[in-house]
Amino acid sequence: MTTTKLLLVLFAALVAAACASTPIGSDSTVTEATAKQLSGDVPLPPGAVIKQQDTLVMSAASTWLGRISLSVSGEPQAVFTYFKDGMPASGWTLTSSSFSKTSLLTFTKGERVANIQMQGTSFGGNDVLITVAPAARPVNSRP
């Protein structure tokens, strides 16, 4: 009976350890190369972690389109303010903002629109989703 209990405890410990470990290469802290690629276009908070499995970036520099999923530490209001102030400093124009449980910021720059969605997590961090897409063009109506 003691051997069975010991095996159960060891098995539970292994399962807990496996759940707690992060697979290599799944997420990464924003590197200097990534920050440089997006520099001048979209500011990324220091220490932000890119969730690679939820991120898709097409093109580079100031013409990129896609989605960047981040995990950002700090108070939700501070993260909201970081993007609200940082995006215009990078040439984006704020078109709408809403601070709540799930906060939203919308910006335009040239032919692109950026939506930033932020939500606080239960562990004191923030999930941030930045989506950059082509701006909708008005349909020309013919008489």
Residue ranges and their predicted role:
Residues T2-L6, A20-P143:
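An acidic-aromatic pocket/loop used at catalytic or ligand-binding sites
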Residues V15-A18:
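C-terminal motif of bacterial Sec signal peptides marking the signal peptidase cleavage site
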